[in-house]
Regions:
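Electropositive, gly/pro-rich neighborhoods at or near active sites that engage anionic ligands
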Residues: 1-99, 111, 259-277
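Alpha-helix C-terminal capping/helix-to-coil transition sites in glycosyltransferase folds
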Residues: 70, 153-154
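Long, charge-dense
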Residues: 92-145
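Short gly/pro/ser/thr-enriched loop/turn and capping motifs at secondary-structure boundaries
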Residues: 107-112, 185-189, 204-205
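Active-site glycine-rich loop that binds ribose-phosphate moieties when present
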Residues: 134-153, 159-166
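A short, gly/pro- and small-residue-rich
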Residues: 165-186
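C-terminal functional extensions of proteins
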Residues: 188-226, 241-277
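Periodic short-repeat tracts
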Residues: 228, 232-242
Length: 277
């Protein structure tokens, strides 16, 4: 595919460039053709959410960072869409959390599993676990049941962006704490995971890495202290700049304890009332 000739000044530049990453993923054998459809669905929800990282997503990101940091054996489960969109950030998250990266795909293909592994290695991963065909989690029938014995099989926390509902439910039934990223707050995955970040993977992943790094270095309070207190009210929908950095993260000092059902309710209300834009 020719390099993009979309100028950065195009009003839909980010969206179009992201779309090209998914197309390139298909051409490279990383992403399933079905992934194009999944991406389009994500785009539609993102459009309705104003293509912004809302306060409910920031709260889920902060909770995810804490849970990943406290995990004994965290694993990042990578599929074809996540890899094409964010290989570098997934590797960075593995580095920050000490989590293992494991390939796990819905649409069965040994070649694509290998292509995903290669792309993660190119992005700097030191180790990428493959699902194999010897160990499986329970409560699921299709290809996604296969796991690595040193990865998802023994994981206590699994970060799995763009998951399908069946496997998310199976992971939970297998005793895992599941953190997902899904722009659709109505999906079965969103409702089944313990933590759902309703945001675009490309926006929230750098923020999640940053949140974990802040926990690692003990700078979380400083980041929050610099934040705009007006954003702290969890009952108000706040659009946070797409390129938010540590100094623009909202202050959650007085936010109530994390609740995934509240996150989903706020995301759904934002969608239905059109207040995302
Ligand atoms: O590589 P494979 O074979 O594992 O296939 C991966 C896909 C994503 C194709 C597969 O898991 C699938 O079909 O997923 P679903 O059931 O379509 O769910 C994808 C969910 O992710 C949908 O709810 C989309 O709204 C959401 N989504 C799509 N793109 C993004 C997203 N959420 C966050 N960020 C995105 N960029």
């Amino acid at each position: 595919m020719p390099a993009s000739d979309v100028p950065p000044t195009h009003p839909r530049y980010l969206s179009l460039i992201t779309r090209e990453r998914i197309v390139a993923g298909v051409e490279r054998g990383v992403t399933s053709p079905h992934g194009l459809i999944a991406h389009g669905r994500g785009e539609a929800f993102d459009y309705l959410l104003g293509e912004a990282t809302h306060l409910f997503a920031h709260e889920a990101i902060a909770e995810a960072a804490k849970v990943l940091k406290a995990a004994r054996h965290p694993v990042i489960s990578v599929n074809g869409n996540a890899c094409a969109l964010a290989a570098g950030d997934l590797v960075a998250l593995a580095g920050a959390t000490g989590a293992k990266l494991e390939v796990n795909i819905f649409h069965t293909s040994a070649e694509r599993e290998q292509a995903i592994r290669n792309m993660l290695l190119e992005a700097g991963a030191r180790e990428v676990l493959m699902p194999g065909r010897t160990h499986a989690i329970q409560h699921i029938e299709h290809n996604r049941k296969w796991v690595h014995p040193e990865g998802i099989l023994i994981a206590d926390v699994v970060f799995v962006p763009l998951e399908d509902g069946d496997r998310c439910g199976a992971l939970v039934q297998n005793g895992k704490t599941v953190i997902t990223v899904d722009l659709n707050p109505l999906s079965r995955t969103a409702k089944t995971a313990q933590i759902t970040i309703v945001d675009n993977l490309t926006r929230c992943l750098p923020l999640l890495v940053q949140a974990v790094q802040a926990l690692n270095t003990g700078t979380t309070d400083n980041a929050n202290a610099n934040a705009d207190n007006a954003n702290a009210n969890a009952n108000v929908n706040v659009n946070v700049n797409v390129n938010a950095n540590a100094n623009s993260l909202p202050d959650r000092t007085h936010a109530p304890l994390y609740s995934n059902s509240r996150t989903l309710a706020e995301a759904e209300r934002t969608l239905r009332t059109g207040t995302g834009n």
